[in-house]
Amino acid sequence: MHLRTNPSICPGRRPAWTLWMCSLFWGCIVSSVWSSSNVASSASSSSSVSQAQYEHHFHGSKHHSVPISIYRSPVSLRGGHAGATYIFGKSGGLILYTWPANDRPSTRTDRLAVGFSTTVKDGILVRIDSAPGLGDFLQLHIEQGKIGVVFNIGTVDISIKEESTPVNDGKYHVVRFTRNGGNATLQVDSWPVNEHYPTGNTDSERFQMVKQKIPFKYNRPVEEWLQEKGRQLTIFNTQAQIAIGGKDRGRLFQGQLSGLYYNGLKVLNMAAENNPNIKINGSVRLVGEVPSILGTTPTTSVPPEMSTTVMETTTTMATTTTRKNRSPPSIQTTDDIVSSAECSSDDEDFIDCEPSTGKSGGELVIPLLVEDPLDIPPIATRAPFITLPPTFRPLLTIIETTKDSLSMTSEAGLPCLSDQGSDGCDDDGLVISGYGSGETFDSNLPPTDDEDFYTTFSLVTDKSLSTSIFEGGYKAHAPKWESKDFRPNKVSETGRTTTTSLSPELIRSTASSSTGMVPKLPAGKMNNRELKPQPDIVLLPLPTAYELDSTKLKSPLITSPMFRNVPTANPTEPGIRRVPGASEVVRESSSTTGMVVGIVAAAALCILILLYAMYKYRNRDEGSYQVDETRNYISNSAQSNGTLMKEKQQSSKSGHKKQKNKDKEYYV
């Protein structure tokens, strides 16, 4: 029989390896996606918790806002460079700036802007006077509760006033005044602009009106006189001093002035910097920097949004003055904390007060959030001590747990914790394994599935904790754990943590106590049987609780001292009652779980592909061969041997020739 290998099989094996590699590759990708999704979900859950905490702190910080001034300037005067703020008291004050004798300006155009807040009906805010004997002046004042400006540059007093709305409402306002010759504009906040123009359009027009009534021979001298007078009508000559507060004129201003600007001079800033040309008299206080409650950044009475100077917001010509509505300050006045300067009163702008010297008058009253003492954290793994109410009395101290105390405790009434009825409590009851951790629980409380945030007892792992959650609780002292002195199934000496199981007698004795007074069970041994010591056990993972025969695992409470302040859900199984309360579950990381699942899925897929390939290749012909099914019958012995041999030789030659021809044809 002639067998030959078909070369077409080799190319057929390459796709199998390719599929195997592709399956492994896609399995890794799936596992990566799985792990990333798990990590994202865990991150979102953790971020939700942190967000809740953050929101809690945010609402808490709302009661500790930074002290702000009662009166706050709008955007036009905001910023550290915009201007200082002074408060003028009841008795009045004066800030006087005097130009040097050789540096007194004469101006054709003036710009004045100031922020203020007051409740007085009459008072002078700012007055600029020329040198003695000239009589030129410019005065910003409040009359009958309305703001106005009066100026005289050589002939008559020119008045411009805001008639629409009073400004002595205690709110903060910004007034802007511009003068160009005899033309003037006045604007308060973003209200409509008030304008003033002389009767004649130009000086020449006024001269032509007067020239008709003057004799011809006097025209020339009158023209020269009018031209000289015209210069006096447009120029504010030899300005000498700026008086702020009105005390020198007997019209006292009471309230707050901020960011005074006049022709490039920031007078209040200069006063705050102790400029030698400025004198301050009377009841005038500078609103200085108030330290922040948080102790991070200093805060002044002027909000930080004031970033533009008054110069940038003043108008120059009435015809081109346009104002947009200003947005209100981002910091709104609340009733939480209102602090202006150094006085604790709300109307200290008008009442004299002294700077705070540590007394109660200058203190900031900060409301504190006091939480309900009953709402203590569900799991306090690092709390050193929680004070017990006086009504709570200890029932058992685990540090003093001995054989005698355990035997006495076993006689007390305790509820049946097994799934069976009141008459069926036996050795199959639930084993309590607290390992002396100070866990307390209420057996009358139903087990819940949302112990992540609401639990019924506290867990102590590596520090002493005195705690009590419910009425009638006890004090538990858990010493610091170490792996070398930790024995899960041995009653240790005084001061050692212990682990026990509930005895059947103890369980049966109190099957019907759930409807009565809620008992409190300490996490410790309830019987006094001495068990064999076990080898040293590492805390992670915690050893499981054993029954009395130490051979069968029985639904332990899974705890982990490495989880700090992270309550987790209590795992439940069908048919098994858990101790209500919080218990921490040791979980693998999401990324590891996803990777393992992906690798297992990829391996299973590869195995299936290999099995399928083996099944296919098993049923496939592995080579080409030919079977000669011709039948040769033995002739009678009477026939000659020569004839038979010839036939055999011919048949063999013909068959070999056909085979050779077929092979040659096949390979070609």
UniProtKB/Swiss-Prot annotation:
Q: In which tissues is it expressed?
A: Brain and arteries (at protein level).
Which residue ranges are recorded for the region named Disordered?
510-529, 636-668
The record's listing under InterPro entries reads:
ConA-like_dom_sf, Laminin_G, Neurexin-like, Neurexin-related_CASP
Q: Which CDD domains match?
A: LamG
Q: Which UniProt keywords apply?
A: Angiogenesis, Cell adhesion, Membrane, Signal, Transmembrane, Transmembrane helix
What kind of membrane protein is this, topologically? Answer: Single-pass type I membrane protein
Identification of the protein by name: Neurexin-3-beta
Q: List the source organism.
A: Gallus gallus
